[in-house]
Amino acid sequence: MTTADGKRRGVAIVTGASDGIGAELARVFAARGHDLALVARRADRLEALADEIVASGAETRPLVVALDLCEPGAIDALAKALDAAGARAEILVNNAGFGLVGRVDRLDPAEQFAMIELNVRALTALTLRFLPAIVAAQGAILNVASIAAFMPGPNFAIYYATKAFVLSFSEALTAELRPSRVKVSCLCPGPVETGFQARSGFALEGKMGAARLALISAAEVARQGYDGLMAGRRVVVPGLMNRLIILVAGHLPRGWLLPLMAAAMNGRPQPDGLSPAASSS
């Protein structure tokens, strides 16, 4: 992936690129002329996406790096893969993550710690590892959080808390890195029809009210996320309804908001107390 003069080619690293918002972000970045490094666990899906991007007219085939970001040494392995391909980090898209729905005392503790590991520690480690190269390139970082970052989430407690971390971390980075001319944006989508809901045990089928009205496609979320990043917007919330939800949540007393959020999550854990991981990794 080196350039004609032998220099390392700058790439946009997209984690959780195998499906959903991550795959759509990869498509948008490719369509806007960025070379890519696609990261997720499922090599077959990444290869298929890379083939699709080439078929759509990309000059350079995306680098495919299949790994689990929670495994020891995974980020070192990603850095080595970039180096071996003659690539360097210019943009980092931290999209990989997953959620679990249910009461915290009825969920598998190991799965809950794995959620923190991916949603918080891996995102932070990726940022710290590739930040020197991104600063040198005056590049950009897009962290994918959720409107969950703005409110507590009964029956989704740890997931919501991890997204609050992502938002706070991103906003602080925006200020810290402004002198370096590095753009940092936090993308905060609401409900999106992807595999997330089915695998988390929280499906939107049959639901009414704000959750349904706020529904937006993964492709539109990705487009707005990219445009917001390029425009230097600190926080990007796709959809008017999602922005209204955040506004209302920010003004309601917590004593009113908590039962409303519990009702929105149905107030019911899964029958066996365990929910499969909702993953974009």
Where are these regions (language model features)?
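Conserved glycine-rich Rossmann-like NAD(P)H-binding loop of the short-chain dehydrogenase/reductase
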Residues: 32-49
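Conserved NAD(P)H cofactor-binding loop of Rossmann-fold oxidoreductase domains
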Residues: 95-100
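Substrate-binding pocket helix/loop in short-chain dehydrogenase/reductase
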Residues: 103-104, 108-114
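Active-site helix of classical SDR
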Residues: 127, 162
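Residue(s) in the substrate-gating loop at a strand-loop-helix junction
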Residues: 146
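SDR active-site lid
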Residues: 179-242, 255, 272-281
